[in-house]
């Protein structure tokens, strides 16, 4: 990304009167990333939009319109309440198993919301369940309140972050759901974020992907053996993630792919599977203080030596805010100054000596 690109954003921020740290979405880049997702969806998949990666109702609605989906994945009870209020037509899958108390709070809240009554949880909300213990807790809640709950079972396809790990326990859960008057099996979810992190010495991406597909297939065979071949026809068979969705070329095994961060490409989602994606989200932080020859307290002579050794930058700035989970990308070669530590108030960054950036301009992070 060029100087001209970020100078253009800086000018736009000044024109708009922005003077505080701001998250910027480049819609043109976002649209190109959405197009890449649509290319994969056109191979036969439904799309579930991961809301924690795009925590903005207007932004979610924009992506939903572009991709033609009503399917959302939610990870946080307060977010769930917002989604039900503002996007009541959505189909929501919880992206992690929630304490049963969270489910209870949701139904307490929902029962008192006249504006959200067009959202029917028994038809539009799936609770993710990772164990028999949690399944029994949810069944007890449902029986006490006479609720119908849609249950999506989390299966371990190699990540080993929980979920049903073997087909025996999985089959026991299927039988429990089948016998319940309050629970309905709505789907399976097998998350496989480890695939793109697998080192070559262990087989790399290709080997890890094949392994996860084999594990998922075993669970599907177990479901058909227990409930009949027809059972998969109407289930949500979910997988994928931002760094792995591009690996799926047909819908023979799964029918739904989830992704969110791939649309905006933060630094920690960089992967070879996303080399065709563009960074589309940036934090712009105003420069409060532009410092030449920065020093540490009480030690001017040592500070000079530290600058010579490169431990302390030759030029620095203190920004408005800081301590974000993001890496500086403009000015080029800007780096966090470790010797001063982290700060959420005024964080110090070393900037190039020859940069023409000045006070009240912005540094950018992604």
Segment roles from a protein language model:
Residues 5-25:
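Generic N-terminal amphipathic, Lys/Arg-enriched alpha-helix
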């Amino acid at each position: 990304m060029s100087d001209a690109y970020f100078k253009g954003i800086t000018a736009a921020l000044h024109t708009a009167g922005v003077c505080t740290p701001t998250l910027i979405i480049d819609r043109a880049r976002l649209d190109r990333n959405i197009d890449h997702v649509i290319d994969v969806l056109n191979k036969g998949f439904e799309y579930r939009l991961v809301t924690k990666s795009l925590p903005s109702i207007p932004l979610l609605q924009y992506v939903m319109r572009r991709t033609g989906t009503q399917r959302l994945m939610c990870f946080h009870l307060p977010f769930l309440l917002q989604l039900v209020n503002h996007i009541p037509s959505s189909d929501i899958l919880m992206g992690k198993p929630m304490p049963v108390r969270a489910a209870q709070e949701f139904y307490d809240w929902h029962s008192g919301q006249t504006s959200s009554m067009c959202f029917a949880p028994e038809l539009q909300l799936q609770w993710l369940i990772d164990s028999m213990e949690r399944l029994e807790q949810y069944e007890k809640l449902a029986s006490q309140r006479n609720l119908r709950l849609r249950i999506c079972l989390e299966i371990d396809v190699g990540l080993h972050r929980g979920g049903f790990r073997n087909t025996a326990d999985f089959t026991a859960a299927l039988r429990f759901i089948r016998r319940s008057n309050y629970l309905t099996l709505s789907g399976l979810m097998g998350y496989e974020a480890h695939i793109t992190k697998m080192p070559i010495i262990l087989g790399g991406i290709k080997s890890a992907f094949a392994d996860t597909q084999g594990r998922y297939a075993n669970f599907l065979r177990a479901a058909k053996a227990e409930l009949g071949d027809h059972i998969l026809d109407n289930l949500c068979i979910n997988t994928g993630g931002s760094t792995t969705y591009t690996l799926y070329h047909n819908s023979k095994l799964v029918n739904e792919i989830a992704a969110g961060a791939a649309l905006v490409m933060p630094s920690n989602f960089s992967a070879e599977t996303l080399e065709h994606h563009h960074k589309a989200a940036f934090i712009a932080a105003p420069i409060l203080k532009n410092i030449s020859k920065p020093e540490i307290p009480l030690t001017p002579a040592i500070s000079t030596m530290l600058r010579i050794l490169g431990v302390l930058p030759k030029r620095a700035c203190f920004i408005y805010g800081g301590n974000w989970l993001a890496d500086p990308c403009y000015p080029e070669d800007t780096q966090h100054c470790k010797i001063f530590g982290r700060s959420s108030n005024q964080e110090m960054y070393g900037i190039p000596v020859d940069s023409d950036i000045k006070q009240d301009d912005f540094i950018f992070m992604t």
